[in-house]
């Protein structure tokens, strides 16, 4: 079981991710648990700040398919994986498994 920190994720999508990742412990930034993976909503955060805050933790960023600027910024910041929101919904367990392997 991985501890997954959600950064900038709205409550609706948090509930969706918790349903998609029932085998993992999903927390928010106010948690004291050290994360194994960070999942960040690129449209709601600054990718560089998240990458700087978690330099040793794998980061999975997501946004909508029209946010090409956000996708580029997350890649440039060094996120380990950057996907569109629909791909995260389709492949969340596999993406987390790849990042924690």
Region roles according to the model:
Residues 94-101:
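Receiver (REC) domain switch/output surface
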């Amino acid at each position: 079981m991985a501890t997954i920190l959600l950064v900038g994720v709205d409550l609706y999508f948090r509930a969706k991710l918790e349903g998609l990742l029932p085998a993992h412990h999903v927390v928010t930034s106010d948690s004291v648990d050290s994360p194994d993976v960070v999942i960040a909503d690129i449209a709601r955060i600054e990718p560089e700040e998240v990458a700087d805050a978690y330099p040793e933790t794998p980061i999975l960023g997501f946004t909508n398919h029209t946010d090409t600027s956000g996708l580029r910024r997350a890649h440039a910041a060094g996120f380990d994986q950057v996907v569109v929101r629909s791909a995260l919904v389709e492949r969340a367990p596999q993406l987390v498994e790849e990042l924690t392997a």
